Swiss-Prot record:
Its main location: cytoplasm. The gene is ybeY. It is found in: Cytoplasm. This is Endoribonuclease YbeY. Its cofactor is Zn(2+). GO terms for cellular component: cytoplasm. Its EC number is 3.1.-.-.
Length: 158
């Protein structure tokens, strides 16, 4: 991987799924490089369900559980210094709930959490998922990124 000067800040404040910080940084850097995104900083927070639901309530006045919250900060192409792409707040436990009995397969579990990170990065880049067409377009980009990351052995891991 070519050296890029993007500060990827990862915080793991949950105990449901072990997350390797370096693995998460690698995933983010590969995606941003693949998409030719130029930014100075991006923040990814792995939270427990309670913390994410509380944030969901604070930001969107909706206390329900969710898998990820993305807060884009600086749009790609803007010239702020430093350029901060955004913040993503992700619940690894949501992947366990989604996969149900298949969550015992750690490869599937980490692939699903990787999808959440990719999904959040796409939101930071301006992709939306409010309509069926937008969801389809986003899912295609997510799947392309997952394929690229699989080839490079850069999916999240424990």
């Amino acid at each position: 991987m070519k050296k890029v000067s993007i500060q990827v800040c990862i915080s793991n404040k949950q105990n449901d799924v072990p997350i390797r910080i370096q693995s998460a940084k690698k995933l983010v850097l590969y995606c941003l490089q693949h998409w030719e995104v130029h930014t100075d900083q991006v923040y990814i927070y792995f939270l427990d369900d309670e913390s994410l639901a509380q944030l969901h309530d604070e930001v969107f006045s909706d206390p329900s559980l969710t898998d990820t919250i993305t807060l884009p900060i600086d749009s790609p192409g803007t010239s702020s210094q430093p350029h901060i792409l955004g913040e993503a707040f992700i619940s690894p436990k949501a992947a366990i709930r989604f996969l149900k009995d298949r969550a015992e397969d750690s490869d599937l579990l980490y692939e699903e959490i990787s999808r959440y990170v990719i999904h959040s990065l796409l939101h930071m880049l301006g992709y939306d998922d409010q309509t069926p067409e937008e969801r389809k377009k986003m899912r295609v980009k997510e799947n392309q990124a997952l394929c690229m990351l699989r080839e490079k052995h850069a999916l999240l891991s424990d």
